[in-house]
Structure formats: C-alpha cells, structure tokens
Amino acid sequence: MKTAIYPGSFNPFHNGHLNILKKAILLFDKVYVVVSKNINKSLDPDLQSRVKNIKNLIRDFNNVEIIINENKLTTTIAKELNASFIIRGLRSQTDFEYEIKYYDGFKSLYPNIEVIYFISDYDKRSLSSTILREIEFYKK
C-alpha cells in the first residue's frame, strides 16, 4: 500500500491545500493530513479547530485521515505511519527554493523517504494561509 503524509500547519486549510490533497489522493492508497504546530506562526485557531475545518472539507474522501502532531518531527510521523512519501505543494519559484531546504532535512533524517511535489493549479497559487489570517484579522 502506498502511504503518504501531507504535513502542514494549515492555519487555515484553504482551497490551495485542498487542490494539492485532491492530486495526492489520486496517486496514493492512503494520505494522512498531519496538522502540526508551527513555532514560526501563530497558533490561533487551535489544532482542534483546524482539524474540524479540514474534516468539513474532506468528508467525502475515503482514503484520507487527519492526525494531530503536537511535537514530533515530520519524518518521525512518517516512520510511525509507515509512510514512504511526504506531500508538498509548490506555488512559485520562491516556494521551490524554500522546499529544497526541507527536502534536504527530510532526507538527512529519513533517507528512505521520498518527497513528492505538486504544483498548485494556477487559480490557487495566490492563496496563502498567512495572507488569509491577516485579512481575517483586519476584518474584525
């Protein structure tokens, strides 16, 4: 069985993330969406709220499971779930340069893992959780 994890803070999980997930489920038997804390980003809303949001968006997906990662490395989660693949999304060349560092880190910690990159569809590339949080903040 081909198993992958799709890790992220998903704060919030938006249509760009959903676009990548829809592509991933076509290739993998099982995809775990791993909702994690990000020490470099705000933790509001809490992990449970983020999971609830994602569940509402993926309720019709049969081969997707959501798990919370409170304090483990992505590669540790992959090993625990017997996942051989990590899913990542790319929107731009800047993302690619950023992701090379993650790739190197993943491979140094778990040499057998493969990182699979999906390019966001054109109409989803401008979406950013950081921008969406900022818009929501200033709407108040």
From Swiss-Prot:
Cofactor: Mg(2+)
Example of a GO biological process term: coenzyme A biosynthetic process
Reactions this protein catalyses: (R)-4'-phosphopantetheine + ATP + H(+) = 3'-dephospho-CoA + diphosphate
Protein name: Phosphopantetheine adenylyltransferase
Binding locations of ATP: S9, F10, H17, G89, L90, R91, E99, K124, R125, S126, L127, S128, S129, T130
Keywords: ATP-binding, Coenzyme A biosynthesis, Cytoplasm, Magnesium, Nucleotide-binding, Nucleotidyltransferase, Transferase
Site (Transition state stabilizer): H17
